[in-house]
From Swiss-Prot:
Protein name (Swiss-Prot/TrEMBL): Ribosomal protein uS12 methylthiotransferase RimO
Keyword field contains Ribonucleoprotein: no
Compartments where located: Cytoplasm
Species: Paracidovorax citrulli (strain AAC00-1) (Acidovorax citrulli)
Principal location class: cytoplasm
Function summary: Catalyzes the methylthiolation of an aspartic acid residue of ribosomal protein uS12.
PROSITE patterns in alphabetical order: MTTASE_N (PS51449), MTTASE_RADICAL (PS01278), RADICAL_SAM (PS51918), TRAM (PS50926)
Residues of the Radical SAM core domain: 147-388
Enzyme class: transferase
Required co-factors: [4Fe-4S] cluster
Length: 463
C-alpha cells in the first residue's frame, strides 16, 4: 500500500527592518538569500522559528527603537539574531552594546553582513534540504526580494564612507567606501525595470564618491565599457530606464564639483531633476567644525548655476541646528541660506550628542532647549519656502506616479510627482477623475493638473 508522506514544514523566519533605505536593501539581500535556500517568512514573532532584527544605531531615538524591538522579539519568540548598525556599536562597558542589553540573543553582526547572518541562521535553524531549491543560485547583486511596493525600489551602489564628519559615527559602523561593480549595479537596475519598477532610487552613504575607492576603473555592461563614476553611472541608468518610461532619482549626493556635470544631464529628462544633497549647514566656520568633505562657501552660487542649467531642479537637503559652538549669527546665516537657495524640501535635526561622535568633545555645547528652539525656527522658515515653491505649481500639468488608488481611483487617490521621493517628501492628492472612463492604477503614471496646495502636498485633478 502506498502511503502519502506529508511534506515537512519548512522553517519560518521573521524579519524586522529598521532605519534608513540603505538598511532596507541589506534586509532585502538577506530575505532573497533566505528565500533561495527554502526558508519561509513569518509576519509575526510568534509564528516564526527564529527572528532577525536589522537595526539602526545612528541617533538615540533609533537606538532605543532598535533595543525595544529586540526585547519584544525575545519576549515573544526567544530566538533572535541581530544585524545592522547597532550591532557594531560598543556599550558603556566596552563590549558589544546589544549583548550588554540583551545577552540572550543568538548572534550579533554589523551592517551589510548577509553571509554572517546566514551563517548564524544555519547554525540555529538548519536550512531545509530540497533538491530543486538547492539548485537555485544565490540572489546577491540581482533584483531579488523587495520590501518596497512593486513600482519603486532602492538601488544601493556602494557601502560605507571615507569621510570623518565630526557629528557622524556611520564610518565606524559601516566602514570605508566600497563601490559595487558598475556592471552589477546596471544589471540589477535592468532586472528591476523588467520586473515592473517605475522608479529607481539610487542610494549610498555618498553617491558622489562612487568609484573613488577603485580609482574610477572601467567596468563592462551589455558588452560596453562603463566607467565606475557617478556621471557615467547615471547616464547609463537613464538610458536603461528610457524604454520603460521609468524614473531615476538620486539620493545622498554630496556637493562635490562633479555634481555640476550631472545637472545638464538632468535637464535632458533622462533622469529626474531632483537632487538630495546633505548640506548640513551653510556657514563656513560651522562646516569646518563639522569637517564636511566639500567646501560650502560657494554653495549658494552653485545652486544658482544649477537652476540656470536645469530650471525644473528640485533640491532636498538635511541640516543640523545647534551644532557645538554655533552662534546666533551663524544660525542666522543658515536661515538666510535657506531662503536664498530656495531649498524645496528641507529636514532639520537638533544636534544630538551621539555616543562616539568627535563633535561631543568640541567646545560650546549648547543647551538642548536652545538646539530645539533653533530647529523649530529653521523648520518654520523651511515650511514658508517649501509652500511658496509649491504654490508656483498651481495650474501646471505634471506626471504623477500613483501610489494609492482604491476602486481604480473613482474616489481619487494619492501619488507623487518628480519632486516627491517616497516617505520623506510630500504627496499629490488626486481628486476623482472627471471622465468616467479615466482610471487610476497603482504603479502607473497619470497626467494631472495641479489645482491647489494642502500643507506640504499638492492637490491635482487627473486628466
Amino acid at each position: 500500500m502506498n502511503e502519502t508522506i506529508a511534506p515537512a514544514r519548512l522553517p519560518r523566519i521573521g524579519m524586522v527592518s529598521l532605519g534608513c533605505p540603505k538598511a532596507l536593501t541589506d534586509s532585502e539581500l538577506i530575505l532573497t538569500q533566505l528565500s533561495a535556500e527554502g526558508y519561509q517568512t513569518s509576519k509575526t514573532f510568534e509564528g516564526a522559528d527564529l527572528v532577525i532584527v536589522n537595526t539602526c544605531g545612528f541617533i538615540d531615538d533609533a537606538v532605543k527603537e532598535s533595543l525595544d524591538t529586540i526585547g519584544e522579539a525575545l519576549a515573544e519568540n526567544g530566538k533572535v539574531i541581530v544585524t545592522g548598525c547597532l550591532g557594531a556599536r560598543a556599550g558603556e562597558g566596552g563590549g558589544n552594546l546589544v549583548r550588554e542589553m540583551h545577552p540572550s540573543v543568538l548572534a550579533v553582526t554589523g551592517p551589510h553582513a548577509t553571509q554572517e547572518v546566514m551563517d548564524a541562521v544555519h547554525q540555529n535553524l538548519p536550512k531545509p534540504h530540497d533538491p530543486f531549491i538547492d539548485l537555485v543560485p544565490g540572489g546577491f547583486g540581482v533584483a531579488g526580494v523587495k520590501l518596497t511596493p512593486r513600482h519603486y525600489a532602492y538601488l544601493k551602489i556602494s557601502e560605507g564612507c571615507n569621510h570623518r564628519c565630526t557629528f557622524c559615527i556611520i564610518p565606524s559602523m559601516r566602514g570605508d567606501l566600497v563601490s559595487r561593480p558598475v556592471g552589477d549595479v546596471l544589471s540589477e537596475a535592468k532586472a528591476l525595470f523588467e520586473g515592473g519598477v517605475k522608479e529607481l532610487l539610487v542610494i549610498s552613504q555618498d553617491t558622489s564618491a562612487y568609484g573613488v575607492d577603485v580609482k574610477y576603473r572601467t567596468g563592462f555592461w551589455d558588452g560596453k565599457p562603463v566607467k565606475t563614476r557617478m556621471l557615467e553611472l547615471v547616464q547609463t541608468l537613464g538610458e536603461i530606464a528610457e524604454p520603460y518610461g521609468a524614473w531615476v532619482r538620486l539620493h545622498y549626493v554630496y556637493p562635490y564639483p562633479s555634481v555640476d556635470e550631472v545637472i545638464p544631464f538632468m535637464a535632458t529628462g533622462k533622469i529626474l531633476p531632483y537632487l538630495d544633497v546633505p548640506f548640513q549647514h551653510s556657514h563656513p566656520d560651522v562646516l569646518r567644525r563639522m569637517k564636511r568633505p566639500a567646501s560650502g562657501e560657494r554653495n549658494l552660487e552653485r545652486i544658482q548655476r544649477w537652476r540656470e542649467a536645469c530650471p525644473e531642479l528640485v533640491i532636498r537637503s538635511t541640516f543640523i541646528a545647534g551644532f557645538p559652538g554655533e552662534t546666533e549669527e551663524e544660525f542666522q546665516h543658515l536661515l538666510d541660506f535657506l531662503r536664498e537657495a530656495q531649498i524645496d524640501r528641507a529636514g532639520c535635526f537638533a544636534y544630538s550628542d551621539v555616543d562616539g561622535a568627535v563633535a561631543n568633545e568640541l567646545p560650546g555645547m549648547l543647551p538642548m532647549e536652545v538646539r530645539e528652539e533653533r530647529r523649530a525656527r529653521f523648520m518654520a522658515v523651511a515650511e514658508e519656502v517649501s509652500i511658496e515653491r509649491l504654490r508656483r505649481r498651481v495650474g501646471a500639468t505634471m506626471q504623477v506616479l500613483v501610489d494609492h488608488a482604491p476602486a481604480l481611483g473613482r474616489k481619487g487617490g494619492r501619488g507623487r510627482s518628480y519632486a516627491d521621493a517616497p516617505e520623506i517628501d510630500g504627496v499629490v492628492h488626486l481628486l476623482p477623475p472627471e471622465k468616467i472612463s479615466k482610471q487610476l492604477k497603482v504603479g502607473e503614471f497619470t497626467r494631472a493638473q495641479i489645482v491647489g496646495v494642502q500643507g506640504h502636498d499638492l492637490v491635482a485633478r487627473p486628466i
